[in-house]
Amino acid sequence: MRRWNRLWDVVLGVIVSLLCAFPVSAREKVILDSDMVEGFDDGVAMLALAQSPGIKLIGVTIVAGNTWVSDGVAYALRQLEIAGQNIPVAAGVDRPFRPQRYELFGLERQLFGMGHDAWVGAFGYPKPESWQKVYRERYGKEPQSRPDPRHAVDFIIEEVRKHPGELTIAEIGPCSNLALAVLKAPDIVPLIK
């Protein structure tokens, strides 16, 4: 019986050694483009991507939608800090892509009503002064990290070019950052996975 146990140990050791000798398949590279909120769908998606062993979250780009960009940047930074993740967060487009969409939103609601859902996201409250002010007021402390200095549009362009054919962009907010990136650098379109 001991002989079989010893043989089994050797066989398992050889299998583990062989598995370790081959490189693990590359992790899927992803940029998350989001109108970030605390927790809920966007925050949960970000943390799931950040902590998934099969994913390398290259960065998080923030766009106005459910929240203003300043709010989204503060929320993303704080959630990543709590999770112990050092992932770039880049501020992006803070107005709807369609001309005068923000300015005409009040009139649109008067003419057509609110529909089944009264939630209007960033359109429903004043734009914050800065992400730092949002962070301090919301969390009562100084931020431990800072957003990436690049605009989200430039972040997307540069990262796609750096990882041609390898990068997935997960859009879970308005697509304004990606739309402007494509308009600014149409060469990236075939490079996105």
Predicted features and spans:
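N-terminal acidic, glycine/proline-rich low-complexity segments
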Residues: V24-K193
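N-terminal secretory signal peptides that target proteins for export/translocation
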Residues: M1-W8
